[in-house]
Amino acid sequence: MEYVTLISNRIRELCKQRGNISFYKLSEMSGVSTSALENIIKGHTKNPGIATIHQLALGFNMTIAEFCDFDEMNMYEFVEEENEVAG
C-alpha cells in the first residue's frame, strides 16, 4: 500500500469516527484548503508535507503522533526512489 493511500484511508476513518465529518468541514476545521485535501484523498498529492499533516491532526484535535499511530502506518516501510537517491 502506498503512503498516500495510508494517509487518505486514515483521514476517511477519522472523519467517519467523528460523526461523518465532511471533507469540506475538515477543511474548515484544519485550515487545509478543500482542493489540497481532495488531492490527498484522491491520491494526486503523493507525499503530503508535515505541515499539512500537522494541520489535519489539529483539525481532528489530535497530535501528529496520534494521527500517525495506526497499525498500517507503524508497519509501513519507507523506501526512497532510486532517482531521489542518485539526485
Feature-to-residue mapping (PLM):
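Conserved hydrophobic/aromatic packing and binding residues within compact polymer-binding modules
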Residues: 11, 26, 37-38, 67
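Recognition helix of helix-turn-helix/homeodomain-like DNA-binding domains
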Residues: 31-47
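DNA major-groove recognition helix of helix-turn-helix/homeodomain DNA-binding modules
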Residues: 51-66
